[in-house]
Design a protein with these regions (language model features):
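Alpha-helical membrane-protein topology signature
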Residues: 1-277
């Protein structure tokens, strides 16, 4: 019997724990990014980190889809909501300007992360509908259709519209994208609660990074909520910043029990059972 070298043992263990290696490599990347950007001391830093955490979450899920050749556990309604949110945000960022200070390097990382996330979402929809349609969970992804989220969110955006771009369309799109971002994840969480079985490691990490993104964006708006409050508004524009913070807090509360199960599963090295949710 041949003796296995230490190098071969290490390679074997790394291959065996490939999912964990991916996860911690991405986590380390986030830590390094934070250390690089923290010296800027800009409020926009948290907005950029939130966007990058979202991008990393989509990179995780695309790795899972390509490796398993399966689109199960991915909510189509969530992807549609997220695409519309990103398009709305990119429109307001590209064709208008506001007074929040942001450096050139932060702007580059912000736009780059948003564009990458958008492309991955479109690619995921392509895989779901044309490459692996038989693996999707369309039967379980019908509890909260995307238009149930988009319509109320757009109405709220009209009422809470601030006056920061001096253009009604951009003002509405700006608030619409922020509120939509805080509620877009709901179809994905509901899909987990509807389908029985275990949540895969990749999918668990995907939601974890989405939660990290929410924490960063909540910190950002806590520091900048007064910026979007329009005291001259005839509707509810004077409370726009408060509405944003409440929506982000509500999302964290909604996802709180999931995070409890997520960290519990990491400690015990077990997958999350969907009947626990």
């Amino acid at each position: 019997m041949e003796k296995i070298s230490s190098k071969e043992k290490i390679i074997f263990e790394l291959r065996k724990r490939k999912k964990d290696v991916y996860f911690w490599a991405i986590s380390l990347s986030i830590v390094l990014i934070i250390l690089i950007f923290i010296c800027t001391k800009e409020n926009s830093l948290y907005f950029v980190l939130s966007s990058m955490a979202q991008t990393l979450s989509f990179i995780i899920i695309i790795l899972r889809v390509t490796q398993n050749q399966s689109c199960s556990e991915i909510s189509i309604n969530y992807l549609i909501c997220f695409i519309i949110m990103l398009v709305s945000r990119l429109i307001t960022n590209i064709f208008s300007s506001y007074d929040i200070e942001i450096s050139l390097i932060n702007s580059i990382f912000l736009y780059l992360s948003q564009i990458i996330s958008l492309l991955i979402c479109f690619y995921l929809l392509y895989l779901i509908y044309f490459v692996y349609p038989e693996t999707s969970d369309k039967m379980f992804d019908n509890k909260l259709p995307f238009y149930y989220i988009l319509i109320p969110t757009f109405i709220l955006a009209i009422f809470f519209k601030p006056y920061i771009f001096r253009n009604r369309i951009f003002d509405v799109l700006f608030v619409f994208s922020i509120i939509l971002e805080s509620v877009a994840i709901y179809p994905q969480i509901i899909l987990f609660t509807t389908k029985k079985g275990e949540i895969e490691t990749y999918t668990s990490n995907f939601i974890a990074f989405q939660g990290l993104s929410t924490v960063f964006i909540l910190i950002f708006w806590y520091k900048n909520y007064a910026f979007v409050n329009d005291r001259k508004s005839l509707l509810l524009g004077g409370f726009a910043g408060y509405a944003i913070i409440v929506s982000e807090l509500f999302q964290l509360i909604f996802m709180g029990y999931y995070f409890y199960l997520y960290f519990k599963s990491i400690m015990k090295r077990k997958k999350i059972k969907k009947f626990d949710l």
